[in-house]
Amino acid sequence: SRDQVAAVRPALESSHAGRWWHALPDGRIQCDLCPRDCKLHEGQRGLCFVRKMESGRMVLTTYGRSSGFCIDPIEKKPLNHFYPGSSVFSFGTAGCNLACKFCQNWDISKSQDMDRLMDQASPEEIARVAAEGGSRSVAFTYNDPVIFAEYAMDVADACHERGVQTVAVTAGYIGEAARRAFFAKMDAANVDLKA
């Protein structure tokens, strides 16, 4: 319901420490989240636009911020053998590490207007709203959850504490170390291969 979706809007900090990166000898940092290996100067963002070098470290600028929340049938993800007939609490952020010309969510995935991410929610609030609203799962969707992996993984932990499953709808364009950590937290995934 709209009330459930509206219930997930607290104020959160604007950036969150990123996990997959390392410092380079020339003062830049390299993002190791996906195979693009973006090399960033202070204040610069990667191709995904949501991972940034800030104060000499990698930060995720969309942690706790969403392009919107929606309750969908699980078949819309599309998953037909994962709790068929159940509701899934779906959300995404902005940005993407791909640039598909055929993207159906380009207004979200390629948005550089972070202010349009009006819906804010902590991992615990997402899990609570999903559980209280009767959703069997939470889906990370609309844009690729790989780029907000830290947030998705924290949401997954909070969901699992409440018995709520998690679903990643992704292209799977992710580095090996991040891939192992990310998918270890997911209960189901739709890996949408891009061609």
What positions do the PLM features span?
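Flexible, acidic/Gly-rich N-terminal and inter-domain linker regions that tether
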Residues: 1-86
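Conserved Radical SAM active-site core
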Residues: 53-189
